C-alpha cells in the first residue's frame, strides 16, 4: 500500500488530484499564518468601509474518522480520473484491515469502511478533494464577503471552516448550505464547538439568532480559530 502511494505520488495527476484555493491546509506554500491573514484582510476591508462583519467558525465532528471512501471514489470519477487509477484507489481504500490492542489482548482482524489514513502520503490530497464541493457550493451562493469582486466568504484550513458575511442573513444562508453539503458527505457540524462573532462599528448589535437545524450557535466575545483568538470589537484583534 505504501509503495502504491509513493508510485502514484511521482505520477503527474495534478489535473485530477487538486483542491480549491480556499483550502489553505495541506499545501507546501501555505500555513496557519496565511489562513489568519486572509480572514484579517477581509474583515479589515469591510470595517474600513464602515461595515460590520459576521464571523462563524464551524467544527466538523470527526471529519477524518468519518471520511467516506465510496464518496471519494465518486468524486474522482466525476473528475474523469483514468479508470486504472480509480480501481487502484478503490482497492487501496476499501481493503483496510486492522486489529485493536487492549493491554495484552489483541482483537480479531476486521475491516475499516471509513476514515482517512493518518500520515498517509495521499491522505491530505484525498481530504481536499472530498471537501472541495463544500467550497464550490458556498461560492455559487453569491453571498458573504467579497473584496472588489474576489470571493472571500469561506476559508478552510484542513477541516477548520470560517465563514465571513456582512449580513446575518447571508451568514445563515451559508451555514445552511454547509450543513446540507456536509450531510451529503456523511459529516456533521458540532454545534457545541461552533461559534459566531461580530467585528466592526456595530459589533454589539446582535438581533438575529444563527441556527443549525433549529439549535442556536452562540455569539461570543472571543472566537478561536486554528490556535488564534479573535476578539469582538470595532476592529480586528
Give residue spans per PLM region.
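Conserved pre-catalytic core of RNA-dependent polymerases
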Residues: 1-129
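Active-site palm subdomain of RNA-directed nucleic acid polymerases
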Residues: 9-23, 126-158, 162-164
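Catalytic palm subdomain of template-directed nucleic-acid polymerases
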Residues: 62-79, 154-185, 199-202, 231-237
Amino acid at each position: 500500500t505504501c509503495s502504491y502511494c509513493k508510485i502514484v505520488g511521482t505520477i503527474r495527476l495534478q489535473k485530477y488530484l487538486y483542491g480549491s484555493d480556499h483550502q489553505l491546509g495541506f499545501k507546501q506554500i501555505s500555513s496557519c499564518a496565511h489562513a489568519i491573514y486572509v480572514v484579517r484582510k477581509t474583515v479589515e476591508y469591510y470595517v474600513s468601509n464602515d461595515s460590520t462583519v459576521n464571523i462563524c467558525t464551524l467544527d466538523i465532528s470527526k471529519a477524518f474518522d468519518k471520511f467516506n471512501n465510496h464518496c471519494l471514489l465518486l468524486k474522482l470519477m466525476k473528475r474523469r480520473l483514468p479508470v486504472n487509477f480509480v480501481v487502484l484507489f478503490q482497492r487501496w481504500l476499501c481493503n483496510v484491515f486492522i486489529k485493536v490492542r487492549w493491554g495484552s489482548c489483541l482483537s480479531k482482524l476486521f475491516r475499516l469502511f471509513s476514515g482517512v489514513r493518518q500520515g498517509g502520503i495521499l491522505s491530505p490530497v484525498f481530504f481536499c478533494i472530498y471537501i472541495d464541493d463544500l467550497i464550490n457550493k458556498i461560492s455559487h451562493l453569491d453571498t458573504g464577503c467579497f473584496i472588489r469582486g474576489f470571493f472571500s466568504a469561506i476559508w478552510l484550513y484542513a477541516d477548520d471552516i470560517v465563514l465571513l458575511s456582512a449580513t446575518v442573513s447571508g451568514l445563515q444562508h451559508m451555514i445552511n448550505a454547509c450543513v446540507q453539503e456536509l450531510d451529503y458527505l456523511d459529516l456533521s457540524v458540532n454545534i457545541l464547538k461552533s461559534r459566531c462573532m461580530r467585528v466592526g462599528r456595530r459589533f454589539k448589535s446582535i438581533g438575529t439568532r444563527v441556527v443549525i437545524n433549529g439549535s442556536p450557535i452562540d455569539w461570543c466575545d472571543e472566537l478561536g480559530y486554528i490556535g488564534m483568538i479573535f476578539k469582538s470589537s470595532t476592529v480586528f484583534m
